[in-house]
Amino acid sequence: MKFSSIILLTLLICSMSIFGNCQVETNKKCQGGSCASVCRRVIGVAAGKCINGRCVCYP
């Protein structure tokens, strides 16, 4: 439950962002390419990529 509330809070802050370039960094390691399956599980959207060895999702 705690993890879900953190994600919801992050999405709320992102939706209030003036610039709209919010991202959700995960602890899931990756090696290049897409993180679509991870982002779909974490925030329900398949928009994400591997940055510095970690999946980063964009709502």
Curated annotation (Swiss-Prot):
GO CC field: extracellular region
Tissue localization of expression: Expressed by the venom gland.
Keyword annotations of the record: Disulfide bond, Ion channel impairing toxin, Neurotoxin, Potassium channel impairing toxin, Pyrrolidone carboxylic acid, Secreted, Signal, Toxin
Cysteine pairings via disulfide bonds: C30-C50, C35-C55, C39-C57
Cross-referenced InterPro entries: Scorpion_toxin-like_sf, Scorpion_toxinS_K_inh
UniProt cross-references to PROSITE patterns, sorted A to Z: SCORP_SHORT_TOXIN
Localization annotation: Secreted
Modified residues (Pyrrolidone carboxylic acid): Q23
GO molecular function terms noted in the UniProt entry: ion channel inhibitor activity; potassium channel regulator activity; toxin activity
Record SUPFAM superfamilies: Scorpion toxin-like
Residues of the site described as Aromatic residue of the functional dyad: Y58
Site, as annotated: Basic residue of the functional dyad: K49
Membrane-spanning intervals of the chain: none
Signal sequence residues: 1-22
Functional note: Blocker of A-type voltage-gated potassium channels of cerebellar granular cells. May also inhibit Kv4/KCND when coexpressed with DPP6 or DPP10. The occlusion of the outer entry of the K(+) conducting pore is partially reversible and affects both open and closed channels. It shares the same target in rat brain than BmTX3 (AC Q8I0L5) and AmmTX3 (AC P60208).
Family: Belongs to the short scorpion toxin superfamily. Potassium channel inhibitor family. Alpha-KTx 15 subfamily.
Domain notes: Has the structural arrangement of an alpha-helix connected to a beta-sheet by disulfide bonds (CSalpha/beta).
Protein name per its UniProtKB record: Potassium channel toxin alpha-KTx 15.5
Organism: Androctonus australis
Lineage start: Eukaryota, Metazoa, Ecdysozoa, Arthropoda, Chelicerata
